[in-house]
Amino acid sequence: MRKIFLATAAVALLLSACKQQPAPLSPAETLIQRLDTLQHGPIMYGHQDDPFYGVSWQWEKDRSDTYELVGDYPAVMGFDLGGLEEHHSKNLDSVPFSWIREEAIRHAERGGIITFSWHPRNPRTGGNAWDVTDSTVVRNILENGEQYELFQGWLADV
């Protein structure tokens, strides 16, 4: 009986010493955790369209002014999705969306943070995102507005 008790106690002790693996974090939880850690640290540097063009060059794969200057990529890279709503193959800065996707994935794999902005065309006038010639644009993309359905379609595409 004593041997059974000692064997049971030994197994219980061994099992209690084993750490349970934590559940894997979702990408959102990982980002929140990283941002929480970084908020008390050094300043993070970001660069819009970093791998697509720089001082005296453009559209050269595997280039980055930041990397060439300091030996590391920016902590944050931003990319614009303007043009996606109209199914263009390139964004409003003429960057192919396929490149944006590729570079966003590469930067995430390096541990970087990616931001996306979206500057759609003006749905009221057809002008660019900075066209403010019509003061009714916002009213017209809201529910019951003339461009509501169009804008909802754009949102679904983006």
Q: Model segments located where?
A:
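Sec-dependent signal peptide recognition
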Residues: 2-8
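Surface-exposed charge patches in extracellular/virion surface proteins
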Residues: 3, 19-20
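C-terminal motif of bacterial Sec signal peptides marking the signal peptidase cleavage site
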Residues: 14-17
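N-terminal module-boundary/linker segments of secreted carbohydrate-active enzymes
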Residues: 20-95, 105
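Substrate-binding cleft of extracellular glycoside hydrolase catalytic domains
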Residues: 82-158
